């Protein structure tokens, strides 16, 4: 998978400092970066950075993403963390602890197709 454009735009030290500051200021929130998968025909999201409540489920967060990209109900959306489709009932806090990046952010990619084929 291509390197996140957020990672390309911001050096590691700056991302680490920002994530640490966010976690300190908002201990019950998770810093998440959401980006569209390459070659996906789904709309672009208007903002990449989210402060997500730790007790939100993946399914609830998918709903937030759907709203942000104004995706119609009949269109599918898949959210991946490190090319894996996380369970919709999983807590964002658990996904964060398991998959957070070295910079302290959780990176999620969304697509209109199940591009990676792993459940």
Curated annotation (Swiss-Prot):
It is found in: Cytoplasmic vesicle, Autophagosome membrane; Vacuole membrane; Cytoplasm, Cytoskeleton. Its main location: membrane. GO terms for molecular function: phosphatidylethanolamine binding. One of its GO terms (biological process) is defense response to fungus. Keywords: Autophagy, Cytoplasm, Cytoplasmic vesicle, Cytoskeleton, Lipoprotein, Membrane, Ubl conjugation pathway, Vacuole. The C-terminal 2 residues are removed by ATG4 to expose Gly-117 at the C-terminus. The C-terminal Gly is then amidated with phosphatidylethanolamine by an activating system similar to that for ubiquitin. The phosphatidylethanolamine amidated glycine is required for autophagosome formation. The keyword Lipoprotein applies. The record marks 117-118 as: Cleavage. Ubiquitin-like modifier involved in autophagosomes formation. May mediate the delivery of the autophagosomes to the vacuole via the microtubule cytoskeleton. ATG8CL-mediated selective autophagy contributes to defense against the fungal pathogen Phytophtora infestans. Belongs to the ATG8 family. This is Autophagy-related protein 8C-like. The gene is ATG8CL.
